């Protein structure tokens, strides 16, 4: 049973997630990796504004202290 945040991230590996950042930025992509600081690696990442895609990226690394939430 996944009770800790890192357990939930582990269960979300290789699946699409939405990541909300400080400053109202949002990314959607496939979670490929993370560490204990909640630094995240997303593949096929897209930046969203108001639910619309504004930029597409191959892979992105998101610094954990900017993450507000991760939605699997």
Swiss-Prot record:
Q: Which Gene3D superfamilies match?
A: 2.30.30.100
Pfam families according to UniProt = LSM (PF01423)
GO CC field: ribonucleoprotein complex
Q: Start and end of every Sm domain?
A: 4-72
* Cystine bridges: none
Q: Which GO terms describe its molecular function?
A: RNA binding
Q: Keywords in UniProt for this one?
A: Ribonucleoprotein
Q: Write out the similarity annotation.
A: Belongs to the snRNP Sm proteins family.
Protein name as catalogued: Putative snRNP Sm-like protein
